């Protein structure tokens, strides 16, 4: 009798254990199903003129915004890019997969080449916006524009929107990367906020020189990284305000930030050398105190606003703070 009772007890233990395992498995299955249910099948983006409903997990993407391209790469989906303007890529994007096909230039898309790729999604840019109607006939077309008056909030929002195309894991990674970038931004900003140095940003272009203000294409420097602008009134236009050597000397900035557009689009750097050796230029506090930052021109002029490009931009300007 005792043996029978012992056997019954043992069987009961096995049954309970089996039930427990089933419950755990069921629970895991339920969690997996719930996670899958949370994944969106569509997201709503914009092309600057209208909202665009886009299916998530696009397999074939054509990208004209290089900052978005580097965000896609950082999130782990570079193989989903099938076409880009490959002629004038900045150096940091030269190692993209060879499978990516050329789709025209950064300002003039090759419509036939794009159509032949049969993309699920086209990510246009401000430079290609005039081709929007032609592009959206091929595939849903969106633009991730940047608000220069609210630069970092605009960029981080775009990064999150790009991540939303690829699901929860991508969104989680994007949040981690944004948090890391914000920590790096704060380190630079803290140094600049304690400084009294005034900064002038200049662009060199085919022998000419233009100055840019705090709400220009260089807003990241002033709004986010907290470089202090000079007291000079500079028009915040897309191409900047024409500036002479006499004007630079009169402003006498403590820091000068230089971008060579000629170099960015494939020219040489001789203009920068000429300017740096100019007698009036040498009389500024910036040159006297070795506080001239020569930006990585192709990075700042052709790209920006992406996860990787933002990291590199921060590294570019940290040099003068060390």
Regions found by a protein language model. Give the residues of each.
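Structured C-terminal subdomain patch of bacterial secreted/periplasmic proteins
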Residues: 60, 154, 254-322
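Alpha-helical, coiled-coil/dimerization segments enriched in small aliphatic residues
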Residues: 87-91, 211-241
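Extracytoplasmic substrate-binding proteins
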Residues: 140-205, 291, 300-322
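Proline-aspartate-enriched helix->loop->beta-strand connector
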Residues: 118-124, 140, 248, 252-256
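Extracytoplasmic ligand-binding site segments that recognize negatively charged/polar headgroups
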Residues: 90, 130, 144-161, 197-220, ...
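Bacterial Sec-exported substrate-binding components of ABC uptake systems
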Residues: 4-6, 19-67, 170-200, 263-268, ...
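A short, structured surface patch at a secondary-structure boundary
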Residues: 60, 65-113
């Amino acid at each position: 009798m005792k043996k029978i009772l012992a056997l019954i007890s043992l069987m009961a233990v096995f049954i309970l254990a089996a039930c427990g395992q089933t419950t755990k498995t069921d629970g895991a299955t339920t969690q997996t199903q719930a996670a899958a249910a949370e994944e969106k099948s569509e997201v709503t983006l914009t092309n600057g003129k209208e909202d665009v409903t886009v299916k998530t997990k696009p397999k074939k993407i054509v990208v004209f915004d290089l900052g978005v391209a580097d965000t896609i790469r950082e999130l782990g989906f570079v193989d989903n890019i099938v076409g880009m303007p490959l002629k004038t890529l900045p150096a940091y994007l030269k190692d993209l997969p060879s499978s990516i096909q050329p789709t025209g230039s950064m300002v003039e898309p090759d419509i036939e080449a794009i159509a032949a790729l049969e993309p699920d999604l086209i990510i246009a840019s401000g430079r290609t916006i005039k081709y929007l109607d032609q592009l959206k006939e091929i595939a849903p077309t969106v633009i991730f524009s940047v608000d220069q008056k609210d630069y970092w909030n605009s960029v981080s929002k775009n990064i999150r929107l790009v991540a939303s195309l690829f699901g929860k894991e991508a969104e989680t990674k994007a949040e981690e990367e944004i948090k890391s970038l914000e920590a790096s931004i704060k380190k630079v900003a803290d140094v600049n906020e304690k400084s009294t140095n005034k900064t002038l940003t200049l662009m060199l272009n085919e022998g000419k020189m233009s100055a840019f203000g705090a709400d220009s294409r260089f807003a990241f420097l002033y709004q986010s990284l907290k470089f202090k602008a000079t007291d000079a009134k500079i028009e915040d236009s897309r191409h900047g305000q024409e500036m002479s050597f006499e004007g630079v000397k009169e402003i006498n900035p403590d820091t000068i930030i230089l971008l060579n557009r000629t170099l960015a689009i494939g020219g040489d750097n001789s203009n920068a050398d000429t300017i740096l050796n100019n007698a009036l230029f040498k009389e500024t506090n910036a040159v006297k105190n070795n506080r001239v930052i020569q930006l990585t021109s192709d990075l700042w002029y052709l790209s920006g606003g992406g996860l990787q490009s933002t990291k590199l931009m921060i590294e570019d300007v940290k040099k003068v703070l060390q």
